[in-house]
């Protein structure tokens, strides 16, 4: 249709008596977004008609060429012009900046005989749009210094540069300039300010600017919705969306994409379905690929994999974004085979796709598959990201594969990670390295990584404190906790679990009591069930059984099987059969089918020689239909897995194993003679055998 309109205007070029009709034709090319071929057609006619030396038509030709995709032709017109005016220079500079030829634009800018407001705005806007935001700010500062009037285009462009740099200090300075200008009430400037504060993570100021706006358009609402969706709380994004609808502002695809993303992060499936219904009724948006991708992602994250697959299959064009969302969705649904099939069928993969499947395997405990896929990623010359390494280190940690973890560490170093925040935030790669080393028992290596990190967050401190605690370095854990407080890092509930666990393993009862009682007062961390479990374990290990029992009974939440089990184990260690029987009954109320309480209680009676009570416990087990599953252990030696069951006598080295068992039992209980050792219950013998087999192979 646009081509026909152009041809109609160009029907009789030879009859044109001045250059104005040619200018109209060139405007038609620009407005209709025609290719440069049509501009060349007009250009040839201009030359034939004898108007090619008019500066007016030459300027229009430069403008048309640059806007229709052939800046080279426009530059040739510019270079051949005997005379140029400010419009001529601006047309070329604007064309260069819009197409990203920024260095060439800068060179031309510096050679201009004069500049005006339009010239400066083109430079600020062009550099901001192409992510050279520092230079955009410099041009803006020079423009202001040289006394040029700043208008709405100047402010919008420089705010975009501040957003690109996440530089709120500069943004605030620009905001104060705007406050002194006539543009504070401009709806586009208001929207740009909301967006700037949003991108800088300042939700409060974004909301304040929005609230102060006299007029708002769809861009204003989108900026605030996106602010909450990206910075949180995401539920506020849904509230703002509801206010937008009540204000009768029609949402566009940007609005809906942000709302769908908020629904995904909140698992707000009902609101997401309502938005989906709105889109289905809108012919214009129904097949929008961005919205389709967002819906696939939302349904996948909400564990509605069937709905996600339905939308995916309905998409006229599928891209890597939708396919990656499906991979993540299948992984969340524990369908790693379906995720791998989707991955295999992808025509095009990016590193995000690889990361999604690697993460899926680690989330589902298929760590060997994750490691294998990472090796394939390397063979196919895909450059891993910080997220790739974080997942692969998690797999190594879960498998306790120190050798592979160290290889992954070498790859991390080769990729130049510095463990600091920024555009590529890789602090959590350092955190993953710490976690891997401490879980593999290499606390010193984990601590070395911790000390070499250029920046640390709360997770870094937590990983190291818990690593110390779990590996028996109680003093070091508490010392590091004190250092954490001195650094100004605020502890969270995970930190306090590590601290209390360290006290428990080291037997620091008074310190544990102190830190538990000061959690809320000093750090604003209300004790959770896990903190009570740590305290019960601490008190139980130290023999303060009644205090541990009182703590459980005074908990503000219902005790679970873990906390009762911890106290029951302590009762066995300290041979408190009366309390042990009470705790076992409480534990069975929580988990009636758990064989653990029966076995521990039976062993306690056996240790005291109360064989009739042992038989009664066993009868109760049979009566309740509770059976004890045989234990299974394994160990990797020189790359080979050795697996064995309780009472398993099939191992080729069983004689050496049982000989060592006798020696170890004698060492473990030197104060008892062999007649006492012979009275060990079968469960205790099984348990000791397991320990021995681990050490003998």
Swiss-Prot record:
Domain of life: Eukaryota
Keywords carried by this UniProt record: Repeat
PPR repeats: 18-53, 54-84, 85-115, 116-150, 151-185, 186-216, 217-251, 252-282, 288-322, 324-349, 350-384, 385-419, 426-456, 457-491, 492-527, 528-558
Record GO terms (molecular function): RNA binding
Region (Type E motif): 563-638
Listed Pfam families: E_motif (PF20431), PPR (PF01535), PPR_2 (PF13041)
UniProt xrefs under InterPro entries: E_motif (IPR046848), Pentatricopeptide_rpt (IPR002885), PPR_At4g14850-like_plant (IPR046960), TPR-like_helical_dom_sf (IPR011990)
Coiled coil: none
PANTHER family associated with the record: PENTATRICOPEPTIDE REPEAT-CONTAINING PROTEIN
Family: Belongs to the PPR family. PCMP-E subfamily.
Protein name: Pentatricopeptide repeat-containing protein At2g13600
Organism: Arabidopsis thaliana
